[in-house]
């Protein structure tokens, strides 16, 4: 009767929840997403690096990206420099020297190979304005004319490619030439040398700067398990700040910082940029040069809730060019996919501190990174990330088997004495204290420790969490097929039992997110139920009844999880069943063998 009531309660709760989702979708208006909103001209008067150090000038204004009131400005017309590498394709605007058009040639927006390529950087004035820019500020009190946002640069000719560097130049008409010497490698790294050539009779002092500007939020915000937004290494320490944190900090800057500054510091080298789940755009200054780095939120004065996010660097000390001399600084720009081997290569080659940590390995990075490397290696060996997950899970279970064997043996012994425990509960059901005393005495007599089954499992928790993290963040999992109907291990199982696996022409998940249950989560639920059947029931009857529904609950919970993670649980549960069954057979065989020997004696 109690089981029936519990089942009724859970069923009614699920029905109410689903009905609420359905009714709410029709009655309540859906929340409106804030439109992508480039910052206005007024907002663009924000300096690059906020309040500078003593002797450092206030840098020039950020280039206009929109008209007042939030209406996107016309995309700046003018000449462009084409960019072509094995992994990148795009162009750079010669008006303002903005790197603002870049696609990743190996990654598509959807699993279909005919879908558009991933657009990493986009032009100012578009709905998803996202660009990198370089410039100079003159020293305080100087009348030196420096390039501005509308400056039209002259290219040395040809497209920018790994085999063909390009130089952009501009003469200020007063004897000073500014140059941007651009080079790009075969992967994702640009090298930008900012040169000032002084043909005049007086010395020149300038402050080179670089910035990344993003005027829209990602469709899926960051979460507890994944950071999105500004990221960098300052003073040898990784510093992450989410979009909301930058926005809040920019509205309330620290004393001495310019408006919009959420974080600012002066240090040697390091790196800073804006990261997503799979992609990164980062500025990497010379590691031996003192620079001012900052995260900013540049609000639209007309609509303070809208604005742009900026990461920038400026030299802390001026760069001097004597008459007839040339002064230069070099900055690297990473713009591409967060592939561990590529990040590691750049970290080593250019001595970039903690550059690998652009991948969000999380708290357990000392575990997550080795798992990440192992899965990537296995995927290369077997040619399939799904097979790599299966092989890795088998290997992990074998390595952990000595640790969990104690737990499985304890659970087997607990299951063997379950009838005796139930008998004691029935006998002393009116005397709880005596009941617990007798049960403890039984445990002692049988040599069973209820906690022994749990303690060996504790060290596994960080490992399993790290594996979940890797499956969630690995770019190797993105659009990686497995077999049959699984075409993307980073996405949920596309099948759904509620439309008879595609036979009915509608999408139940449109009514409620709970109405999505694919084949793989169902298999996972079955394996979880089988594993639960081998475990001894909890001593508390109420807890035991609740545990009966855990496979059903987890099946629905994992219905919207990445197929790669569900595949791991399926394999892990199946191997656990085999291990438990083998140990239980051995544990039960020992008493039977002893009984047979006694009978023969």
UniProtKB/Swiss-Prot annotation:
Keywords: Cell inner membrane, Cell membrane, Chaperone, Membrane, Protein transport, Transmembrane, Transmembrane helix, Transport. The keyword Lipid metabolism does not apply. The keyword Calcium does not apply. One of its GO terms (molecular function) is membrane insertase activity. Residues 34-63 are annotated as: Disordered. Residues 54-63 have a biased composition (Pro residues). One of its GO terms (cellular component) is plasma membrane. Residues 39-53 have a biased composition (Low complexity). Required for the insertion and/or proper folding and/or complex formation of integral membrane proteins into the membrane. Involved in integration of membrane proteins that insert both dependently and independently of the Sec translocase complex, as well as at least some lipoproteins. Aids folding of multispanning membrane proteins. Belongs to the OXA1/ALB3/YidC family. Type 1 subfamily. Interacts with the Sec translocase complex via SecD. Specifically interacts with transmembrane segments of nascent integral membrane proteins during membrane integration. This is Membrane protein insertase YidC. It comes from Acidiphilium cryptum (strain JF-5). The gene is yidC.
């Amino acid at each position: 009767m109690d089981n029936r009531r519990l089942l009724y309660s859970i069923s009614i709760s699920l029905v109410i929840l689903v009905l609420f989702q359905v009714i709410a979708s029709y009655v309540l208006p859906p929340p409106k997403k804030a439109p992508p909103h480039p910052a206005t001209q007024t907002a663009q008067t924000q300096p690059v690096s906020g309040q500078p150090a003593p002797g450092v000038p206030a840098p020039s204004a950020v280039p206009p990206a929109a008209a007042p009131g939030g209406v996107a400005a016309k995309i700046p017309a003018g000449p462009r420099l084409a960019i072509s590498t094995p992994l990148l394709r795009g162009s750079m605007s010669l008006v303002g020297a903005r790197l603002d058009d870049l696609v990743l040639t190996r990654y598509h927006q959807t699993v279909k190979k005919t879908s558009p390529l991933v657009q990493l950087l986009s032009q100012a004035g578009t709905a998803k304005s996202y660009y990198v820019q370089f410039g100079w500020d003159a020293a305080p009190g100087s009348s030196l004319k420096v390039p501005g946002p509308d400056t039209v640069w002259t290219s040395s000719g040809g497209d920018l490619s790994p085999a063909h560097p390009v130089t952009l130049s501009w003469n200020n008409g007063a004897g000073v030439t500014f140059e941007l010497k651009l080079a790009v490698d075969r992967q994702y790294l640009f090298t930008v040398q900012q040169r000032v050539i002084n043909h005049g009779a007086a010395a020149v002092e300038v402050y080179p700067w670089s910035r990344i500007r993003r005027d829209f939020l990602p469709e899926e915000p960051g979460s507890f398990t994944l950071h999105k937004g500004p990221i960098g290494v300052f003073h040898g320490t990784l510093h992450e700040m989410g979009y909301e944190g930058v926005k809040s900090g920019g509205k309330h800057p620290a004393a001495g910082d310019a408006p919009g500054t959420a974080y600012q510091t002066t240090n040697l080298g390091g790196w800073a940029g804006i990261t997503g789940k799979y992609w990164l755009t980062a500025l990497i200054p010379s590691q031996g040069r003192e620079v001012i780095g900052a995260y900013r939120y540049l609000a639209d004065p007309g609509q303070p809730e809208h604005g742009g996010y900026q990461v920038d660097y400026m030299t802390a000390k001026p760069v001097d060019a004597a008459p007839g001399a040339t002064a230069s600084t070099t900055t690297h720009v990473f713009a591409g996919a967060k592939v561990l081997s590529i990040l590691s290569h750049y970290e080593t080659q250019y001595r970039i501190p903690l550059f690998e940590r652009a991948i969000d390995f999380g708290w357990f990075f000392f575990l997550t990174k080795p798992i990440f490397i192992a899965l990537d290696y296995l995927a290369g060996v077997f040619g399939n990330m799904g097979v790599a997950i299966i092989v890795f899970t088998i290997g992990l279970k074998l390595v952990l088997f000595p640790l969990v064997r104690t737990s499985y043996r304890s659970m087997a012994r607990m299951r063997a004495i379950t009838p005796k425990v139930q008998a004691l509960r029935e006998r002393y059901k009116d005397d709880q204290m005596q009941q617990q005393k007798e049960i403890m005495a039984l445990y002692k007599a049988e040599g069973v420790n209820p906690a022994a089954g749990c303690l060996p499992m504790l060290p596994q928790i960080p490992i399993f969490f790290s594996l979940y993290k890797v499956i969630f963040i690995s770019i190797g999992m993105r659009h990686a097929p497995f077999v049959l109907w699984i075409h993307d291990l980073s996405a949920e199982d596309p099948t759904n039992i509620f439309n008879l696996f595609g036979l009915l022409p509608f999408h139940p998940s449109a009514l409620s997110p709970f109405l999505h249950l694919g084949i793989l989560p169902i298999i996972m639920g079955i394996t979880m139920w089988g594993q639960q059947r081998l475990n001894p029931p909890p001593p508390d009857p109420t807890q035991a009844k609740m545990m009966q529904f855990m496979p059903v609950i987890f099946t629905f919970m994992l219905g919207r999880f990445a197929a790669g993670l569900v595949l791991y649980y399926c394999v892990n549960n199946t191997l656990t069943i085999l291990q438990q069954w083998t140990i239980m057979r051995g544990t039960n065989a020992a008493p039977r063998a002893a009984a047979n020997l006694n009978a023969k004696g």
